[in-house]
């Protein structure tokens, strides 16, 4: 992932593709109540660009992103209230890889499987959510592959950003602070060593 590690940065193109998958597919059932389209401006998109994206997705620039599916319909369809995706990438260990794997985990169920939908990466293998993705489902303007594998990576990256948009800044600032502290410690050590060397000579 481009946003991992020292010097990591959000991949704007990937997050934009992930936005497409999230708004065209995920929002059919899931909401993103702690995310607003306007938040994309923090990545460097202009207000006009974000306004256009919001309009295409029938969203309002400064309003939380909510699903049109109400709780009664969720319970009737899935037997549960569908989870909000705003902080899903933080709610699971190694969340971004968990989300990607989950999207890729829909395979043919073994003969002895008992349940609704089989997913080899979901705990217990039985997941209420049907496979949401298929090749060619979302059209990308940048020429990226329109495959389940690409959709899965893109929506995972988008949800990682949605859950913690300040991750990259905090990660890089923290690393530079540690480097600064290490240099100061080294400088202090060398200074003290020089002082004591002079003291011993006296």
Residue spans for each PLM region:
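Electrostatic cytochrome c docking/interface patches
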Residues: 1-20, 31-42, 50, 143, ...
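Second-shell loop/turn segments in exported
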Residues: 5-8, 84-89, 139-145
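Extracytoplasmic/secreted proteins, especially bacterial periplasmic and envelope-associated proteins
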Residues: 13, 17, 21, 84, ...
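Bilobed periplasmic-binding protein/Venus flytrap-like ligand-binding cleft at the lobe interface
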Residues: 21-22, 99-107, 158-162
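Membrane-proximal low-complexity regions enriched in glycine and acidic/polar residues
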Residues: 48-126
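Extended, hydrophilic extramembrane loops/domains of integral membrane proteins
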Residues: 129-164, 168
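Juxtamembrane interface at the cytosolic side of transmembrane helices
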Residues: 170-173, 181-202
